[in-house]
Structures are given as structure tokens and as C-alpha cells.
Amino acid sequence: MELILVRHGLPDWAPDSFARNDPHLSELGNLQASRVAAVADRWGPIDEVWMSPMHRARETAAPIGESTGLAPVVHPWAYEIRNPDQWEGSPIEEIKNAWIDANLRPISDLWDGLPGGETFRDFHQRVVEGLVGALAELGITRLDDGHPHLWNVPDDDQRVVLVAHGGTNAVVIGHLLGAEPTPWEWDRFESPHTGVARLSTLAIAHGRAFSLRVFGDVSHLDPEMVTK
């Protein structure tokens, strides 16, 4: 089984200098999305395209759906960690300062997420539980309780694309590789906009384990188009 993770294109975070919690893609972001869709045929036959419900993920998934002939399916669990509600419409400079202040807190406080937003603990649990449930619908289940990172995979030829976010995709990668979670997953697995990661299963004893084969691939972009 192969899981292909695509981060969304560059968003227009503050089109009028005021922040948006669920922004649309920028002009460059739309171009990045069209470029990654243009190379989807190189990934091999795709069975399903999944996407986060956020605008930037939907708008990145749309051309991939057109390229593959598949209708992207919304998975609510793939939503990025939720920003504080009060950030919506706030001056962008205030948001930048809030990020700086939040990152200066003690490490133990980082698990609480941004003040007023979703905690990292809740975010991690949401993504992992949603991922495990989505895989189960494909018949992919954990081998047993003693080996949580080994899986029963009935069809090694399955291939699924998930279009989501830096945080969501990082949690997915960390969990499938068996890495201990940290509240800085975004930095541990930092992917550029429309960066592609590919995880595939390989035989380990009587089960299958996920192996990270490609990460942060932006070969579909010109160098000046690469953004983080």
C-alpha cells in the first residue's frame, strides 16, 4: 500500500492585511497546485484522493482530482490544528507577534497549542484516530496490540493521495513511522507548499510496516516557486 501526502499550495493568509483562519490559495498557490497535479500521473494508478475540508487543501486537491479522474473525498480529521477564533480578522502583524510569543513558552506549555486554539494533544489524537479509521475502511488494520506500528495490509497495490497540511501530514508521517509525538511536528517534518511525501508498506515478519520513501519533493516547481 502506498500513501502519498501532498501539502496544500501557498495560501493568501491576509489578503487585506487582516488574518484569515481558513484562507484560499494565493495566485502562486494555485500555480503550485496545477504543477503538482500535472505530475500526478507519475505516481502510478491512484485508487482514492482524500482531502482536508479547508479551502487551501480543497483548492490544491481539485486539479489533482481532475488529473486522476477521481473526485476528492473530504476527511474532516485532516483539518489543520485550529487557530484561536479571535485571530480571524486580526491585523497580520499581531498574529506574527503572537506566534513569536507562543514559541518562547516553556516546552511543556507547547502541548497546549496556541492560547485559545486547539491543543496539540487534541489535534494529534484527532488526526491519528481519523487516519486509523480511514485505513480500516480500506481493510488496513493494526497487526495486534503488541505491535501498534505493524499492519495487516490486504492489498499491497492500493495507492491513496491525501491533500492536507504541514501539521496534519507531519502527524501522519510520525505516527506511521512509530515516532514519539512532539508538539513541533511541523518542524520535524517540514514540507514546502505542494511538497510530496510517499510512504509505502513493506513486509516485516507477518505484518507490514510503513517506510518513508520520498519527502518534501517539489521537483514539479521551478526553484523560484518553492515556498514554505
Predicted segment positions?
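Phosphate/ATP-binding catalytic cores across multiple sugar-kinase/actin-like superfamilies
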Residues: G133-T141
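Phosphate-coordination/substrate-recognition cap region in phosphate-metabolizing enzymes
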Residues: R35-L104
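Loop-to-helix element that buttresses phosphate recognition and phosphoryl-transfer chemistry
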Residues: I4, G9-I64, G116-G130
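Beta-strand elements within well-structured catalytic alpha/beta cores of enzymes
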Residues: E2-R7, W50, P154-A164
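Active-site metal-binding loops of divalent metal-dependent hydrolases
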Residues: G9, G166, G216-V218
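GST superfamily/GST-like fold recognition
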Residues: G166-A170, G195
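Short glycine/proline- and acidic residue-enriched helix-loop micro-motifs
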Residues: I100-D122
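Acidic, low-complexity terminal tails and accessory targeting/binding regions
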Residues: I81-E93, I140-L143, P148-R159, G174-K228
